Curated annotation (Swiss-Prot):
The keyword Protein biosynthesis applies. Promotes the exchange of GDP for GTP in EF-1-alpha/GDP, thus allowing the regeneration of EF-1-alpha/GTP that could then be used to form the ternary complex EF-1-alpha/GTP/AAtRNA. NCBIfam families: aEF-1_beta, PRK00435.1. Keywords: Elongation factor, Protein biosynthesis. Belongs to the EF-1-beta/EF-1-delta family. It comes from Methanococcus vannielii (strain ATCC 35089 / DSM 1224 / JCM 13029 / OCM 148 / SB). InterPro entries: eEF-1beta-like_sf (IPR036219), EF1B_bsu/dsu_GNE (IPR014038), Transl_elong_EF1B/ribsomal_bS6 (IPR014717), Transl_elong_EF1B_B_arc (IPR004542). This is Elongation factor 1-beta. Pfam families: EF1_GNE (PF00736). One of its GO terms (molecular function) is translation elongation factor activity. The keyword Cell membrane does not apply.
Amino acid sequence: MATVIAKIKAMPTSPEINKETLKESLKELVEKFGAKCRGVIDEPLAFGLYSVFIMVEMEEQEGGMDPIEEAMNALDDVESAEVVELSLV
């Protein structure tokens, strides 16, 4: 099986959400799926809004990144999450 690297963009529900807490929640969620977090960064947008990008590495499997993406979307502090880049290594 191949290794998959994905870049997932998560948008918080409001600018008041603590960035560091959100980043830690996303890292923990990724690790629950047996994947490795290869980096997390936040990118400012406007008016205090920001997006969080998380790099995820895992073995290729049926369903791909969908289960992780769905779990991120289910978090209370996440408005939306989507895979923006995907590559096989």
